[in-house]
Amino acid sequence: MLTIAMNGTKHLVLNRRKFLGIAAGLVAAGVIPRNALALAAPYSFKQGAYDITVVSDGTLTLPFSVVSPDAKPEDLAKLLGAAAQGDKAQFEASPLLLKSGSDVVLLDTGAGGNFGPTMGKIAESLKAAGTEAGAVTKVIYTHAHPDHLWGTLGADGKSVFPNASFHVAEAEWNFWVTPDLASKMPKDMEGMVKT
């Protein structure tokens, strides 16, 4: 369960399914243009009391075997269209910046520089949107995959968002802190959970 509280008032209580459904609905309704999430430059719009900006941590290229291990590569290539590059797919890591009153909330932080030179652009993108990383007051993780939270730390190991509090759904937290989780993961994904 995710509660977004801004200026001390609960505005939105969501589970992951409801959050993703709302996001998909906004795209389908044209509130967020389909191509906005693929833009490298910040894209801003207003929704109720929120000023929302789509920022970027960069682009991420993943093999089809990671994107959808059970799908046929030719089906994925057809589905992904221009995002497909041979047997790989390119995605934009697009965290959302929400502002309301004194709250500056970042939904996800991207992958940081851990996925190569095309990632790790979140501080630069925030600055292009008129916000310094140090101004972020809350970071909310939609889920704890590396491409959503590894952008929290810089190359120096320090927080990119030194003045923020950090939030994740309780069920998500409990999953990732499960004892011996690495032994339950596929071999090629054990590195996601080993410390």
Describe the residue ranges of each PLM region.
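Active-site metal-binding motif and surrounding structural segment of the metallo-beta-lactamase
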Residues: P95, P117-H167
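Conserved beta-strand hairpin/beta-sheet module of binuclear metal-dependent hydrolase folds
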Residues: A41-A129
